[in-house]
Every structure is written in C-alpha cells, then in structure tokens.
C-alpha cells in the first residue's frame, strides 16, 4: 500500500537519488520529505496535470536551509574569497607646484576682446609714433636745407659785374662807368682776400653805378637824337 505522502503528492519521485550532486551532504531523515517536496515543486516531475499539490508552510524554512547549503554557495564563497596573491598598483602623477600667481581662466569671447583691444591700442600707438617720427624727419630735413642754403649763400662769392661796368664805361655815360669799373676791381680784390662782406658791398656799388651809367647814357643818346632831328627840320624849312 502506498504511503500517505505519496497519495498527497503523486508528482514527487519515489527516490531523491537523482537530486544528489557531486558534493554529498549530511542527510537528516526528518527533513528529507520537505526537501523532496521543494525539489519536486521547483524542478517539476511526471504525473497527472490535474492533481493539486499542497505545500506545508512549516517545512519552508527547512527547505530553504537545504537549498542554500555549502554546496550551493561554493561558487559564491570562491568568488568572495580574498585573493592572497593579487596586488593592486596605482600610479599617481606628481605635479610640481607652479610658480607665480594662478592664471584665471578666461572664456573665448573675453580672450578675443582682449586681443582686439590690445591690437587696436598697439596700432594707434604705432601710428602716433610713425607720425612723430615723420614730423621729426621733416623738421630735420627743413633745418638741414635751410642751413645748407645759408652756407651756400655765405660760401658763394659775390659777382664783380666786370662786363656790365665795361659796357657802361665805353658805351654809356663814361664817368659813372669808370666809377663802376673801379668798384668792380675792388670786389675782385676782396674775394681774393676772402673778405666776402667787403666784396658784397663793392659788388652792389658797382652794379648800381653801372646801371645808372647805362640809364644816363641812354637818356643822353635820346636827347641828342631829338636835338639833331629838330635842327635838321629847322634847316630844311629855311
């Protein structure tokens, strides 16, 4: 005759030998029926599908203890065991302290504005410097030109007007022409001596007398021509 447990649980196998693993456990006769029920419920077995299987609440604790035996937790214990032969190596980078004040981070917009402002100020300063340099160069050039002209004026000897004095003496009013020729010779002597001040004075006098002699001579020639014409006209009527 079948036992009461077999009648109540027809789906359970008759022997739990197929549930033995490679690691034998100490079996306790009172709790084996509960383990058998739990294994049968979890793993399933052959039997009629319409039969209802009842679970004893009191045997649940024993079933859980049987399920979580050292054989089931063997892999977990192996995983949790500390590794005696392993060691961790950490690499740390030593950063030397930077000398000077720390730089404040600036955004791209602010950096662009700073660069633009510096560029503008630099261009204005350079332009002002170029203008000042140009003005200084122009002033120095003007000063040097004036000094050169003064030097040239002082170094150039005055003219003696020899040809003009000769013409005034021979062809024009000869008394003034002779005086102009005299001052012309004095100019040449002053130039030869290096006295440019006296040479310039005598040169101006010679020029004035020669011009006056020419003017007086021209006036005399005109007067003589007019007198001659008047005389010829009177003789013709008489």
From Swiss-Prot:
Membrane topology field: Multi-pass membrane protein
Cellular compartment(s): Membrane; Golgi apparatus, cis-Golgi network
Primary location class: membrane
One GO cellular component term: Golgi apparatus
Topological domains annotated Cytoplasmic: 184-205
Intervals, Extracellular compartment: 1-162, 227-238
Acidic residues bias spans: 129-151
Region of interest: Disordered: 1-29, 83-111, 127-154
Keyword Transmembrane helix: yes
TM stretches of this protein: 163-183, 206-226
Keyword Zinc: no
Domain of life, per lineage: Eukaryota
Keyword set, alphabetical order: Golgi apparatus, Membrane, Transmembrane, Transmembrane helix
Any Pfam family the entry gives: CD225
PANTHER family: SYNAPSE DIFFERENTIATION-INDUCING GENE PROTEIN 1-LIKE, UPF0338 PROTEIN
Family membership: Belongs to the CD225/Dispanin family.
Protein name: Synapse differentiation-inducing gene protein 1-like
Gene that specifies this protein: SYNDIG1L
